[in-house]
């Protein structure tokens, strides 16, 4: 069982509450939607990457006008280019952090991420210094009770499903990354329409618990990283956050 397992729904609830109050999340989704639409067709029915981003944007309650603006921009003649990046580092007392970025200026982003680590009790690491302690998984969360039935549905659809957990009226499905879309389609085919989370996540193999000053320092570091416009996702191995 993944260490994130039983408490995933609580983590999602906290994240949704935080992101919902932060307009930065809308701007970040705008960039992600633009990139997905620009790299393929601006139609989600013929562009699976765009469809996936729009599904996540819906879960984050991104306003329609933000989505439409990003797609319209992709349809235009703009040649703005964005590059994906990943940075790894350490916080206090064994905490590990992965930062995924999407930026039009790599030098700016690298400097900002390094500064965020340095000014908030962390240290940047080399590529691979942290990520080997995480596993990339597809994660799907939705309302439900019967984990066994969901597991059977996914197996029948030939989905490479790693685990299905049920707790407090919430089902959490873990898949191999390449089978996330396949799992979603299988669930939809069985009548599941609403999803709280559909994400590719970096799941820590082990977690650490921080307390007191260490915890406050770590929260400040995460806040500083997430405040950067170029940072799309921040993963870490700290429990109960």
Swiss-Prot record:
Top-level taxon in the UniProt lineage: Bacteria
InterPro entries recorded: Integrase-like_N, TACO1_YebC-like_2nd/3rd_dom, TACO1_YebC_N, Transcrip_reg_TACO1-like, Transcrip_reg_TACO1-like_dom3, Transcrip_reg_TACO1_YeeN, YebC-like
Iron-sulfur recorded as keyword: no
Biological process per Gene Ontology, one example term: regulation of DNA-templated transcription
Residues that span the membrane, as ranges: none
Residues spanning the signal sequence: none
Subcellular location: Cytoplasm
GO cellular component: a single term: cytosol
A GO term for molecular function: DNA binding
Keyword DNA-binding: yes
Keyword set, alphabetical order: Cytoplasm, DNA-binding, Transcription, Transcription regulation
Predominant subcellular localization, coarse grouping: cytoplasm
Alphabetized PANTHER family for the sequence: TRANSLATIONAL ACTIVATOR OF CYTOCHROME C OXIDASE 1
HAMAP family assigned: Transcrip_reg_TACO1, Transcrip_reg_TACO1_YeeN
Family, similarity comment: Belongs to the TACO1 family. YeeN subfamily.
Name assigned to this protein: Probable transcriptional regulatory protein stu0195
């Amino acid at each position: 069982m993944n260490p994130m397992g039983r408490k995933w729904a609580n983590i999602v609830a906290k994240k949704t509450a935080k992101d919902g109050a932060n307009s930065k999340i809308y701007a970040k989704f705008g960039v992600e939607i633009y990139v997905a639409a620009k790299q393929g067709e601006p139609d989600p029915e013929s562009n699976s990457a765009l469809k996936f981003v729009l599904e996540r944007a819906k879960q984050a309650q991104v306003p329609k006008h933000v989505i439409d603006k990003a797609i319209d921009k992709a349809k235009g003649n703009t040649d703005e280019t964005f590059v994906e990046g990943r940075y790894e580092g350490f916080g206090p007392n064994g905490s590990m952090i992965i930062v995924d970025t999407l930026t039009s200026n790599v030098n700016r982003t690298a400097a900002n991420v390094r500064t965020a680590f340095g000014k908030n009790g962390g240290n940047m690491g080399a590529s691979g210094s942290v990520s080997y302690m995480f596993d990339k998984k597809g994660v799907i969360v939705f309302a439900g009770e019967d984990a066994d039935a969901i597991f059977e549905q996914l197996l029948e659809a030939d989905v490479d499903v790693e685990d299905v957990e049920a707790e407090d009226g919430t089902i959490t499905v873990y898949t191999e990354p390449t089978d996330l879309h396949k799992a979603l389609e299988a669930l939809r085919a069985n009548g599941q329409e609403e999803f709280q989370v559909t994400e590719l996540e970096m799941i820590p193999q082990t977690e650490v618990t921080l307390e007191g000053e260490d915890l406050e320092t770590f929260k400040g570091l995460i806040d500083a990283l997430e405040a950067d416009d170029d940072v799309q996702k921040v993963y870490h191995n700290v429990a109960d956050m």
